[in-house]
Amino acid sequence: MPDKFTLNDAYKRFTGDQDKVLTPRETIDNFMQKAAGAGLDILKETRRVDRGRLGIPVYSSICGQDAKNMTGTAKQMGKGATPVQAEASAIMELVERFSLYRFSANPANFQTDRQADLKDKSMSFAVLARSVDDISGNIDAVGRFFADLPLRWTTAWNLTRGEKVLLPFDWFFAINQFNGSCAGNCNEEALCQGICEVVERHVCCDI
């Protein structure tokens, strides 16, 4: 995490049924180039799996051995208005899931500590409780218990306040797993994807 994270303008260059800074073909080509240079077996192949009944192309991205070992899954699905959009979608689903699990597996990304020791450096328990709509009436007691738990904390950036904050990674991962993990052609594009997914899942749970 850099000392300061800044959102920049991301100009749309592709607007065919979606707004992106690159075309779907450029997205696929960028991934293939970066994956080849990583020295990891991430993507085995992509396959078109729809039968044309709905007129919506659907692709699967089949995990390479390194991705399969890391994520525990064999494939992801992606859809789009065109076959190349669907293929790019399936690949980016793999990218975000693989990246999340790889991040989780790297001890250098975390510090194990109690919230009671981190104090103002960490996200407050009140915010965590609101994020899951806790209406138990035992917030104070649960907060004291939570503050004493040794957890893995990772550095994040609070976009609203413009500052770093420590997040209890495993607390979020246990509840959400890969909900909200996101990939894009740039930081801003990825964040739009991830934030919208969190809103989508939250509303779904709410109703």
Tell me what each language-model feature is:
Residues 1-207:
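Helix-coil modules at protein/domain termini and other flexible surface or pore-lining loops
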